[in-house]
Amino acid sequence: MFDFASYHRAATLADAINLLADNPQAKLLAGGTDVLIQLHHHNDRYRHIVDIHNLAELRGITLAEDGSLRIGSATTFTQLIEDSITQRHLPALCAAASSIAGPQIRNVATYGGNICNGATSADSATPTLIYDAKLEIHSPRGVRFVPINGFHTGPGKVSLEHDEILVAFHFPPQPKEHVGSAHFKYAMRDAMDISTIGCAAHCRLDNGNFSELRLAFGVAAPTPIRCQHAEQTAQNAPLNLQTLEAISESVLQDVAPRSSWRASKEFRLHLIQTMTKKVISEAVAAAGGKLQ
């Protein structure tokens, strides 16, 4: 039995915001895959709970007429994987969701929880970065929209105040032609394991050149990151193996991995360069291009 000091089930989003404001120690419970572990270990910081699991305002995937997408923060990873909209418009996000844990976890774990947990290994963070998502955040002070790039502020930390709730992810319209994206995860096991290194890439091609490249890595720095030096190297560069090699060298200026029991810093640097080539090659192929 969990040792709750207080438990409140929010009836609406407004109710949840008020409950958070009235309970400064409260933690949100959506999927529960992180919070319940803390409760199991009797973490005193998780004894006050506001349950938002059943809030309709936090769920659903919608496509607007202009091609922009909205994904509710409490949407589960299984829902992301199975939805035709995300399959068509955000394939790297679907691939990342498919790499998370196992079916039982994906059935309950939420997209928003994975991002707000703040872990650099969060598998959904890198595709969210390459698709330039904005986060819709509600609080007693109103609504604000912030870019995903910069939302992670340190290990286990995000730019979210206690009385704020991440309500939805908003994705800008994606070009329909000559674009491709991919996600790749390296872990010690094929399933039920967190990333040793994770990455995602999105590219737009134009007449045999990189018109744009977006590259993101997880577990390559204290937070999930976009790789600015690598992206600049690709800008308007020819679509060939020499450019790919140059990008894999430039990416070393963007990353700062550490050694841990999972992998040494040196091995992670090797993985980063190797995975840069792999994920970009897959994104180029998805865009209909070929590296010569």
Curated annotation (Swiss-Prot):
One Gene Ontology term, aspect cellular component: xanthine dehydrogenase complex
FAD-binding PCMH-type domain location: 1-176
Catalytic activity entry: xanthine + NAD(+) + H2O = urate + NADH + H(+); hypoxanthine + NAD(+) + H2O = xanthine + NADH + H(+)
Pfam families from the UniProt entry: CO_deh_flav_C, FAD_binding_5
GO biological-process terms attached to the record: hypoxanthine catabolic process; purine ribonucleoside salvage
Cofactor(s) required for function per UniProt: FAD
Stored Gene3D superfamilies: 3.30.465.10, CO dehydrogenase flavoprotein, C-terminal domain (3.30.390.50), Uridine Diphospho-n-acetylenolpyruvylglucosamine Reductase, domain 2 (3.30.43.10)
SMART domains found in the cross-reference section: CO_deh_flav_C
Binding site for FAD: 27-34, 109-113, 165, 184
EC number: 1.17.1.4
Listed GO MF terms: FAD binding; xanthine dehydrogenase activity
Biological or metabolic pathway of the protein: Purine metabolism; hypoxanthine degradation; urate from hypoxanthine: step 1/2; Purine metabolism; hypoxanthine degradation; urate from hypoxanthine: step 2/2
Keyword Oxidoreductase: yes
Main enzyme class: oxidoreductase
Keywords tagged on the record: FAD, Flavoprotein, NAD, Oxidoreductase, Purine metabolism, Purine salvage
Quaternary structure note: Heterotrimer of XdhA, XdhB and XdhC.
Function: Presumed to be a dehydrogenase, but possibly an oxidase. Participates in limited purine salvage (requires aspartate) but does not support aerobic growth on purines as the sole carbon source (purine catabolism).
Stored NCBIfam families: PRK09971.1, XdhB_XDHase
Identification of the protein by name: Xanthine dehydrogenase FAD-binding subunit
Source organism of this protein record: Escherichia coli O157:H7
